Amino acid sequence: LDVLVNNVAFQSPVDDFMELTPSQWRRTFDVNIDSFFHTIRAAVPHLTGGGAIINTGSINGLRGNKQLIDYSATKGAVTALTYSLAQSLLERGIRVNCVAPGPVWTPLIPATLPADQVGEFGRQVPYGRAAQPDEIAPSYVFFAAEQLSSYYSGEVLAPIGGETLPG
């Protein structure tokens, strides 16, 4: 195994913190961070001679989001996991980095947003729209290609549509 990409997410917006149920909280953590732990743990013995682990975070993990509290918490955990594993796996020659994009148009969007909000998705960023997946893909290629990123580990690349600060 040369490269592991962790790219999974569940989100369910709430209008008020008290709407966030313990079961939703647990499900979000199960999908968005616990799965990363288990996948990485299974992959590390197969990343012999180095390799790369690329975790998918989110701008919401860097700045929070009042309607995506659980999602934001898990993506913040992804960032911390990336930093910690970059240190822990350095002696094995494994680079660990994170791509933390802003809004990206994926099947998750119409599946989780109310229909009247789907058309507005991503309009808040300076580019005025969500990214397309192929606009984010080069971030993963960069971290996967040893000849491009051999000196990078513990980094978070945030393609966020023209924003200059994560807050």
Name each model feature, range by range.
Residues 15-17, 21-26, 121:
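Substrate-binding pocket helix/loop in short-chain dehydrogenase/reductase
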Residues 58:
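Residue(s) in the substrate-gating loop at a strand-loop-helix junction
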Residues 98, 120-148, 152, 159-161:
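C-terminal helical subdomain
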Residues 45, 87-91:
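Alpha-helical segment proximal to the catalytic Tyr-Lys
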Residues 11-14, 63, 148, 153-167:
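Short C-terminal tail/terminal secondary-structure segment
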Residues 90, 95, 151-153:
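Short, small/polar-rich loop/turn modules that mediate ligand/substrate recognition or access, typified
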Residues 40, 74, 82:
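Active-site helix of classical SDR
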